[in-house]
Amino acid sequence: MVIRILKLARSAARLILAAALVVGACRASLAQGDADLEAPGLEPFAAPVSSGTTLFQNVRIFDGQSATLSAPANVLIKDGIIARISANPIAIDANAKIRTVAADGRVLMPGLIDAHWHAIMASTPQMVLMTADPNYLQLVAARQAQATLMRGFTTVRDLGGPVFGLKRAIDEGVTIGPRIYPSGAFISQTSGHGDFRFSFEVPRVPGGQLSHSEAEGIAAIADSPDEVRLRAREQLRQGASQIKLMAGGGVASPYNPIESTQFTEPEIRAAVEAADNWGTYVTVHAYTPRAIRQALAAGVKCIEHGQLIDEPTAKLLADNGIWWSLQPLLDDEDAPPLANPVSQQKALEVFAGTDNAYKLAKKYNVKTAFGTDILFDARLTTRQGAILAKLVRWYTPAETLKMATGDNGALMALSGFINPYPGKLGVVEEGAIADLLLVDGNPLENIKLIADPDKNLLVIMKGGTIYKDIATK
């Protein structure tokens, strides 16, 4: 018996030692920050064309702020930053390894920014999203991230979904894609727009198993200020750059009227306080004046959608310097696929309000961001640039492109000291991050050039690294 006990003790000791080694290895891996990409079989599946120093010669610049193009100029990119812009030739060291792009007078502009994106949900049908293996969904999202970058969108603000791993993989060069400002799981009340539970997952049992959508990190359900605060802090712990709450009814969710106001002011304020302590902000999904006004009273700094807004509430947004992240949602070829008749009817209500919303945003000079909010359809993702081009129904091409570059860049900076990409985005100026597009043609005259990125985007650069170059012979 004693011998047996000694053997068991030795086995236990070996297990403890092995566990310690595993924990140590995990900590070492986390400390290093990325995988060993030099190891066989771990090369990035899509390598960039070139990185390092790049010189763009003879470009006309749309800087993300002005309404006109610059005179012919030269732009030097070094260490991922726009190092110099000059009307005169920029001297370079003959021995230096510099990639030169002869632009021949083409337009250099900032990379596009989509302020309302869902990397996990954009190209996956809703029922697949709710039932498929999470690993499959991540692989689909990685493929879509590459396509997003190749459409010229160098940054996205992700407003719901488990994208922390995808963001890390992109940042570390494991795969390619845009910069991601992640929200993590969107926070919803029970029966709210983010409550996608199946009928067998209701009622909620205190301390019970999470629903499928919660376990995947798509949604987080909370029903008190304390629960909202907890869920917000969980997203911040994982690396959220802003917090997303569902403050009103939605289209794709079957269990709530679109006119409903969701959460209470104290519940929303709990998330605002948690975000503010982290130096960042809360944005909310809301369509109606009542939902928007309650969110503003709680300290929210950004409204998503808002198509059912009224004029006094639009003026309130302007008077308080609130961001309005608005999407050109219309009853056209870009309408999302919705099988549920209830959702279809709610979508028509939203579509009917879009024109008025943009007119009010422009009338009161509200700080307006551009986003697509593409959901559940791979075909629609290919039209990301075409959806941006629709804004010329209300804005000039210059105003449209400014919204999707310089203005959206200012919104990204609202994440304060937890900004995952410190520096200036969305502009072409010395010292800014070198996220750039070289366009074959003038998008200030023909914005539809953006809708055909394969043909018209000759160079796509993110952080000084070129991912596409069909301009250099």
Where are the language model's segments positioned?
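Histidine-rich, glycine-flanked metal-binding segment
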Residues: E38-L42, A46-S50, I61, S66-M109
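Boundary at the C-terminal end of the N-terminal hydrophobic targeting segment
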Residues: A28-G33
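Bacterial N-terminal signal peptides
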Residues: A12-R27
